């Protein structure tokens, strides 16, 4: 923990094409080795694929997908009297978004399609339709929290 007080939250600039901070955060999550231009190109091509397939605005589809991925509850390990309990806690809004974006990118990378553009587009489309690996991850997280509901009184 810093001695000089809380660290200031850095604000991201909205991306030039969609003027959205959410898109910028997704680009930053996708970026590998500081290659932001490459990540940007991949995302924009994915959005083009989504627009082509659905006929809807890619941004709306992406926002719906993210809404379907973001978890409401998660479990945190809490040590009580020599035993570790998985305590269900509510996820803060900022962390919800971060987890949603992280899961979206991670599960898109694990898909079998040939290019990253296709993988990301398909994962976003699946998530928008409430299917896909990222949505399954959210469901598993919620199931875990539900299963450990008995330890909710250990919340801090």
Curated annotation (Swiss-Prot):
Keywords: Ribonucleoprotein, Ribosomal protein, RNA-binding, rRNA-binding, tRNA-binding
GO molecular function, one term: tRNA binding
Gene Ontology process terms (BP): translation
Record Pfam families: Ribosomal_S7
Keyword tRNA-binding assigned: yes
Any one of the GO CC terms: small ribosomal subunit
PANTHER family on file: RIBOSOMAL PROTEIN S7 (PTHR11205)
Task of the protein: One of the primary rRNA binding proteins, it binds directly to 16S rRNA where it nucleates assembly of the head domain of the 30S subunit. Is located at the subunit interface close to the decoding center, probably blocks exit of the E-site tRNA.
Similarity annotation: Belongs to the universal ribosomal protein uS7 family.
Quaternary data: Part of the 30S ribosomal subunit. Contacts proteins S9 and S11.
NCBIfam families in UniProt: rpsG_bact
Name listed for the protein in its UniProt record: Small ribosomal subunit protein uS7
């Amino acid at each position: 923990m810093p001695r000089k007080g809380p660290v200031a939250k850095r604000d991201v600039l909205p991306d030039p094409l969609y003027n959205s901070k959410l898109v910028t955060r997704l680009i930053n999550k996708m970026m590998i080795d500081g290659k932001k231009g490459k990540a940007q190109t991949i995302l924009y091509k994915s959005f083009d694929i989504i627009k082509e397939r659905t006929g809807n605005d890619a941004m709306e589809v992406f926002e719906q997908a993210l809404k379907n991925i973001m978890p409401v509850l998660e479990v945190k390990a809490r040590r009580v009297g020599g035993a570790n309990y998985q305590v269900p806690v509510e996820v803060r809004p900022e962390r919800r978004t971060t987890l949603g974006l992280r899961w979206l990118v991670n599960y898109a990378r694990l898909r079998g399609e040939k290019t990253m553009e296709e993988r990301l587009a398909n994962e976003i489309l699946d998530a928008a339709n409430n299917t896909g690996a990222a949505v399954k991850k959210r469901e598993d997280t919620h199931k875990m929290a539900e299963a450990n509901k008995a330890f909710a009184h250990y919340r801090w």
